[in-house]
């Protein structure tokens, strides 16, 4: 066997031994985050476990566990009666359901669930229409999307590098496509 193959085989086996979850050494015992499941606890019998509407859906539907009315041009809080353990390395983003936004002018806000939050998940609903919007028990009001995050430490500096854009914001680049 050529020397390159011997070294490759040796390092490959060593890497496998160091990175397996059942190794008996203290060098590298880090279990990867589990993105296959997430824990959910029902806080009432009216709570509904989040589900995806289709195999390709990005979000898990969140349902209201209580009846409520979102007043015209107002807001309301829809409680799901769920505790959700968001996997480490991610956060849960509460996003609008496209059908509610398009058909009923219902949007949602304040949509971040941190991985260490363990309270009842609530959905802030905004009604941008001229009529009150009724929510029944079990109605799907939002969707939960898991997103990976990076949490670097802030570093205070005296200067920040300049860019071509600079401080321009809020439409400073225009609406036309740049050629």
Curated annotation (Swiss-Prot):
Functional pathway: Pyrimidine metabolism; dUMP biosynthesis; dUMP from dCTP (dUTP route): step 2/2
Bilayer-crossing regions: none
EC class name: hydrolase
Cofactor or coenzyme needed: Mg(2+)
Temperature-dependent activity: Optimum temperature is 60 degrees Celsius.
Molecular function terms from GO: dUTP diphosphatase activity; magnesium ion binding
Any one Pfam family match given in the protein's UniProt record, by short name: dUTPase
Protein EC: 3.6.1.23
Keywords, comma-separated and alphabetical: Hydrolase, Magnesium, Metal-binding, Mitochondrion, Nucleotide metabolism, Transit peptide
Positions of disulphide bridges: none
CC per GO annotation: mitochondrion
GO biological process: one example: pyrimidine deoxyribonucleoside triphosphate catabolic process
pH dependence: Optimum pH is 8.
Gene3D superfamilies listed in its UniProt record: 2.70.40.10
Span of the transit peptide along the chain: 1-41
CDD domains: trimeric_dUTPase
Compartments, record wording: Mitochondrion
Catalytic activity line of the entry: dUTP + H2O = dUMP + diphosphate + H(+)
Subunit structure: Homotrimer.
Family assignment from sequence similarity: Belongs to the dUTPase family.
Function: This enzyme is involved in nucleotide metabolism: it produces dUMP, the immediate precursor of thymidine nucleotides and it decreases the intracellular concentration of dUTP so that uracil cannot be incorporated into DNA.
Protein name: Deoxyuridine 5'-triphosphate nucleotidohydrolase, mitochondrial
GN (gene name): dut
């Amino acid at each position: 066997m050529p020397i390159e193959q011997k070294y490759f085989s040796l390092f490959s086996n060593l890497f496998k031994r160091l990175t397996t979850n059942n190794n008996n050494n203290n060098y590298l015992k880090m279990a990867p985050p589990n993105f296959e499941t997430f824990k959910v606890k029902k806080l009432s019998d009216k709570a509904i476990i989040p589900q995806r509407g289709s195999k390709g859906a990005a979000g898990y539907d969140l349902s209201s566990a209580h009846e409520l009315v979102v007043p015209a041009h107002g807001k309301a809080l829809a409680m799901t009666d769920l505790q959700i353990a968001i996997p480490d390395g991610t956060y849960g983003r509460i996003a609008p359901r496209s059908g509610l936004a398009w058909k009923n002018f219902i949007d949602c806000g304040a949509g971040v669930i941190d991985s260490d939050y363990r309270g009842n998940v609530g959905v802030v609903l905004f009604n941008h229409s001229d009529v009150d919007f009724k929510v029944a028990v079990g109605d799907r009001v939002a969707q939960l999307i898991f997103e990976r995050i990076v949490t670097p430490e802030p570093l205070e500096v005296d200067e920040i590098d300049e860019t071509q854009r600079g401080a321009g914001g809020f439409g400073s680049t225009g609406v036309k496509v740049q050629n």
